[in-house]
Amino acid sequence: MTPMAPDTLHSAPQAGPAILLTGFDPFGGGAHNPSWLIAEALHGQRIAGHQVVAAQLPTVFGQSLVQAHQPALTLCLGLAGGRAALSIERIGININDARIPDNAGAQPIDTPVQSGGPAAYFASLPIKAMLRGVQRAGVPCEVSQTAGTFVCNHVLYGLMHLLAQGTAPQGARGGFVHVPWLSGQGEPHLPLRDMVRGIHAALWAAVLAPQDIALQAGDTH
């Protein structure tokens, strides 16, 4: 998996430890991707002394990891149409199995994200603390046990593999949140302002919780 140079005007490196917040460009024929609209809305805000830096990723296999800011924390956002809540991903798996082509026309099937890499990585952000923070902000939220097998999972696994190699700053953490459709894109949906508020709350929780909390958020199947 090849790191990609930042490709938006919001991606100039900032002084001090940053929070890197990424979203995707539109894919699958959609006009907008709410993941990028959320990241763009939070760009420049300060959270507990860390400045949020937004960067847009292309929905393309093998080119979807931005790592230019030496961030203390990286949170990647992606669209999961059909979900009704912000979905904090627990795990990324080492497989690409694309149901549709990416924006470059590639459709890998049963290929590894990282050849020779482990089967999976857990997100290193405090997902339960983030869940509680988002819910307390009044925004629907859940812990998800699968990030799929498309580009979102590819990015989550790739990010965690990069952090595991020790090339990021010591103590750097990362994770992924899937977001629903916007109003007018499909059902179920959430208003953009609610999703922005929820991700803002998730970032605060991630920064302020060096260790996760015990909170029931599992599934039976």
Question: Which residues does each PLM region occupy?
Answer:
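Hydrophobic, aromatic-enriched interface-forming segments
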Residues: 153-158
